[in-house]
Amino acid sequence: MTGADGTYDYKAMAAGIVLAGGEGMGNLLPVVEKELLHYRILDAMMREGFFSSLVFQGGTSLRLCHGSPRYSEDLDFAGGTSFDMDTLKGLGSCISDSLSGMGDDVTVRVKEPRPDADGLTRRWRIAIRTAGQRKDLPSQTIKLEVASIPAYEPQHRPALVNYPMFPALSGQIILDVESPTEILADKLLSYACASHLRRRDLWDMCWLASRGDVDSRRAMELAELKSSDYGEEGLWADRADRVAGVADVIGSDAFADEMRRFLPAGLMT
């Protein structure tokens, strides 16, 4: 992907995508911009060899590797039980250099994990601003997280090119990504054990359950395994049946309001 020669003007590209999509894309400009930044970050990570110990997971992996129509925000990876931060040394500067290379008017800040951070997850927080951006508008912020947990069904595959009209996105990004069945397991566990309603996870669960290549029984088995990986066996045992009571959530105004930020209007009916 090209840099400061002006061929990766992500804001202009996103505006063109939204305009071409018609009225149904009107609310999606921020997440379209973010998706173009996802491509840029993943391309840089691949070129610098950071994928060797990581497996892509989460909502963005569904969108970029498995064809979900729902836009997403952050980048999530499984690093394995023996994950070592030293394997990602230089990741922050890799991301910063790549995003800064989009143009002289782009400012990038990458907040790296604390060296003494404990727990299962390490998080990089990436903030991007352009010179012409109104000061009252927030920076584009993307969280990149690596969890010290295993992936049980990794698949080696390319990221999808969602916008073939832009040559800057034509480079092939290849990485390991969890299977749709394993991602469903993650979503089941997250939805059941979270302290708050995770409406996007619920939408993803419904979309995954409709696919012919997803084994729902296997997903429940994996969710139980993963509850141990995350230290949430007790919560999972107590709340696994929470996923059965989703009809009221799906029919709520709050669910519709949240999903409007991530889905084209044609999928909201």
Where are the predicted features?
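Structured mid-to-C-terminal alpha-helical surface segments
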Residues: 1-55, 65-68, 80-269
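Glycine-rich beta-strand-to-loop/alpha-helix junction loops that act as flexible
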Residues: 57-60
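Anion-coordinating catalytic cores for phosphoryl-, nucleotidyl-, and glycosidic chemistry
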Residues: 72
